[in-house]
Amino acid sequence: MSVRAHTYVQLSVAGALLSLAVAAPPAAAGQGHAVPLRVATYNIHAGTGSDGVFDLDRQAAALRALGADVIGLQEVDVHWGARSGNLDVAGELARRLGMRVSFAPIYSLDPVEAGGPRREYGVAVLSRFPIRSETNHEITRLSTQDQNPVPAPAPGFGEVTLKVRGVPVQVFVTHLDYRADPAVRVAQVADTRRIMARERAALPGARQVLLGDFNAEPSAPELGPLWKELDDAGTGTGPTYPAAAPVKRIDYVAVGDGVRVEGAGVPAEATASDHRPVVVDVSLVRKGPGRD
C-alpha cells in the first residue's frame, strides 16, 4: 500500500475540529457499510507543557478538545518520579476523560521505597470502547536506563483490540528511537511490520491503526518499508514538533487495509506538551452488506 494524498484541513483545538465532526459523525452513529471513527496521537511529554509546567488538567483539556474515540499517547509516566508528581499519568488522564486505558511500559523499575509502586514509563491507549484484549510487544530498543546500552528486544509497543459497531480493530501505539543514527529505527520498523502482520493473521478481518511518535519525517528512508503496508493518514497536514513553533512532522496516524481516511489535521495546541497532536477521521469499511 502506498502513501496516498487526502484532503486535509489545518485545525485549532479551540473550534476548527468541528469541521471534521460535521464531515464524520461520532463512531456510535455509524450506519451502512462504513463505520466512522476518530483517532488521535499525542506525545504528552510526561504531562509537562512546552512552558516547562506540569499540568494534567491542561493536557486533559487538550485531549478532550480532540473529540477522539481512540488516542495513542507517548512519554507516559506511571509513578515514575517527581517530574510528574509520582502520579499514574495514564490513569489520571483516563479518569478525567471518562475513557478506558491500556498502558504498555517501556521501562518498569523497582520502587524507590519498599512496598511502593513500580516506576514505569511508556505508551498508552485511551479508548471510548471496551478494550477486548491488550498486549505489550517487544521491539528493538537502545535503553536510556543503561550506561552502555546495546540494541535489544524490550517492551513498549502497545496493542489493544477493540470492536467498533461490530468491526474488529487492532490499535497499536509506538514511540520509535530518537537518535540521529537511524539504525535502531530501521530495526524497530522491521519489528513493527512483523508484529502487525502476525497480529493481522491471528484476527482475519481486523482493521489496523498505528499511532505514534516515529522520530523521523515521512521521507526518512527507515520509514519507507512501513508505507508499503500502511497509509500515512497525515499526508498534507502541518508539522508537529516542537509544539511552540513546529518544523518537523514526526507524529503519525497510519492505517491499514479497510480503513479509509476522511480528513486529518494538526491542532494548533502549542502549550500543553512539547509536541502537537494529530487527529484523523476514518471510516472502517465493511466487507459486505452485513457486519464483519
PLM regions and their residue ranges:
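N-terminal, active-site-proximal structural segment of metallo-dependent hydrolase catalytic domains
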Residues: 6-13, 17-120, 186-190, 285-292
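Active-site beta-strand/loop signature of hydrolases that rely on acidic residues for catalysis
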Residues: 37-44, 59-84, 126, 160, ...
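Metal-dependent phosphoester/phosphodiester hydrolase catalytic core
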Residues: 163-185, 190
